[in-house]
Curated annotation (Swiss-Prot):
<comment type="function">
    <text>Transaldolase is important for the balance of metabolites in the pentose-phosphate pathway.</text>
</comment>
<comment type="pathway">
    <text>Carbohydrate degradation; pentose phosphate pathway; D-glyceraldehyde 3-phosphate and beta-D-fructose 6-phosphate from D-ribose 5-phosphate and D-xylulose 5-phosphate (non-oxidative stage): step 2/3.</text>
</comment>
<dbReference type="GO" id="GO:0004801">
    <property type="term" value="F:transaldolase activity"/>
</dbReference>
<keyword id="KW-0808">Transferase</keyword>
<dbReference type="GO" id="GO:0005737">
    <property type="term" value="C:cytoplasm"/>
</dbReference>
<comment type="similarity">
    <text>Belongs to the transaldolase family. Type 3B subfamily.</text>
</comment>
<dbReference type="InterPro" id="IPR004731">
    <property type="entry name" value="Transaldolase_3B/F6P_aldolase"/>
</dbReference>
<dbReference type="GO" id="GO:0016832">
    <property type="term" value="F:aldehyde-lyase activity"/>
</dbReference>
<keyword id="KW-0570">Pentose shunt</keyword>
<protein>
    <recommendedName>
        <fullName>Probable transaldolase</fullName>
        <ecNumber>2.2.1.2</ecNumber>
    </recommendedName>
</protein>
<keyword id="KW-0704">Schiff base</keyword>
<dbReference type="InterPro" id="IPR033919">
    <property type="entry name" value="TSA/FSA_arc/bac"/>
</dbReference>
<dbReference type="InterPro" id="IPR001585">
    <property type="entry name" value="TAL/FSA"/>
</dbReference>
<dbReference type="InterPro" id="IPR022999">
    <property type="entry name" value="Transaldolase_3B"/>
</dbReference>
<keyword id="KW-0963">Cytoplasm</keyword>
<feature type="active site" description="Schiff-base intermediate with substrate">
    <location>
        <position position="91"/>
    </location>
</feature>
<dbReference type="Pfam" id="PF00923">
    <property type="entry name" value="TAL_FSA"/>
</dbReference>
Length: 222
């Protein structure tokens, strides 16, 4: 299983990369806005510069989302983003216009991430259109009393049935159990906020054991 970090914060990306477990990065307009703050406008050029800065930190794929809602606009923005670095993956929503853009990008050898996926039928269409990745949002489904992990199970089963090469990125991850369940189901990737990466590392018995070992080690003369 691959781990992506779901953030636009450069410090968090660097910290995750230093752990040696980071395979890629996903961003979206909300994460970019969080980094930009409200002090000044975040221009399109500033957005592209920020994606370029992320690409300098990581070796793996970096997903950057288009903001246009029509296929032509998505294609124009996506081509600009793809020109930044060969690692850039264009995130497009699974809409009628988004599927057109995904199909275009597939025909032109530009990687795509079909995002805002909440049903197996959306994931099936994304794979048929040629998406490189598909991102079902498990946490947001859980928020509306729907089993997000069941969606992952359905998508993985469908893709295996028909040998689709589209990879499943489990997105909107809220806690470490989401990651464990995704791994057990067989999802290709989990994209994880930095706080959840820290949750994956932490266990109270590890901390208690380390405390005891440290106390006992104090009697050893070096």
């Amino acid at each position: 299983m691959q781990f992506f970090i779901d953030t636009a914060n450069l410090d968090e990306i660097r910290a995750a990369a230093e752990l040696g477990v980071l395979d890629g990065v996903t961003t979206n307009p909300s994460l970019i806005a969080k980094v930009a703050g409200s002090s000044k406008p975040f221009t399109w050029q500033a957005f592209k510069d920020h994606i370029a800065a992320i690409c300098e930190i990581v070796d793996g794929p970096v997903s950057a989302e288009v903001t246009a809602l029509d296929a032509n606009g998505m294609i124009d923005q996506g081509e600009e983003l793809a020109d930044i670095d060969g690692k850039v993956v264009i995130k497009c929503p699974v809409t009628l216009e988004g599927l057109k853009a995904i199909s275009y990008f597939d025909e032109n050898d530009i990687m795509t991430n079909a995002t805002l996926v909440f049903s197996p039928n959306q994931a099936l269409l994304a794979a048929k259109a040629g998406a490189t990745y598909v991102s079902p949002f498990v946490g947001r489904l859980d928020d509306v009393s729907t089993n997000g992990m069941e969606l992952i199970r359905q998508i993985v089963t469908i893709y295996r049935n028909y040998d689709f090469i589209t990879e499943v990125i489990v997105a909107s991850v809220r806690h470490s159990q989401h990651v464990v369940e995704a791994a057990m189901i067989g999802a290709d990737i989990a994209t994880i906020p930095f706080n959840v990466i820290k949750q994956l590392i932490s266990h109270p018995l590890t901390e208690a054991g380390l405390k005891k070992f440290t106390e006992d080690a104090a009697i050893i003369q070096m």
